A protein has these predicted regions:
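Intrinsically disordered, low-complexity Ser/Thr/Pro/Gly-rich regulatory segments
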Residues: 1-167
């Protein structure tokens, strides 16, 4: 998920409808996002495609199978996160992600909650600064050996920090 304040400001109007989608489809949310990951795969280090065509049923965890969650896909289309959605029940699904950020959010099971908490902090109007997906590096080592933590949402009021982990 993005770290740029400008990007969040550009997407603020999308956060509540996205969270509403989550609430309406929360029972199947993990499968829905897993489906989005499987139908838009990327090799390690590669960027997932913007335009997607795939099977209606994909491989799930531990040999399971996940069917397209049609209602959730239509809800993503209704809020403008997907374009050109075409579902052939039992056979195939195709669509185009609106942009790189919505693609990232629809492929990350926790992004909806992080965005909602970020917006809640903004709406509270008591913080001087708010950032999501803040990365804290605890040493001088770069690369795989470095010690880092990702903080889902970090807000400050004066010199007092608030660290929020979304689960």
């Amino acid at each position: 998920p993005c770290q740029d304040q400008y990007i969040h400001e550009k997407y603020l109007k999308d956060i509540d409808p996205f969270f509403t989608c989550f609430l309406e489809h929360r029972r199947d949310w993990t499968d829905t996002i897993t489906y989005m990951q499987r139908i838009s795969p990327a090799e390690y280090g590669q960027v997932p495609p913007m335009s997607v065509q795939g099977k209606y049923i994909v491989k799930g965890e531990r040999g399971g199978r996940i069917s397209a969650k049609e209602e959730a896909l239509r809800a993503f289309k209704d809020i403008g996160f997907l374009h050109d959605l075409n579902i052939v029940s039992g056979d195939a699904v195709s669509f185009r992600f609106r942009d790189e950020n919505t693609r990232a959010w629809l492929r990350d099971v926790g992004s909806v909650l992080e965005l909602y908490v970020y917006k809640a902090c903004l709406d509270a109007d008591i913080f001087n600064d708010i950032i999501s997906s803040a990365v804290v590096r605890w040493d001088e080592v770069l690369g795989h050996a470095s010690v880092i933590n990702e903080i889902d949402v970090m807000a400050t009021r004066g010199v007092v920090p608030l660290f929020i982990s979304c689960k």
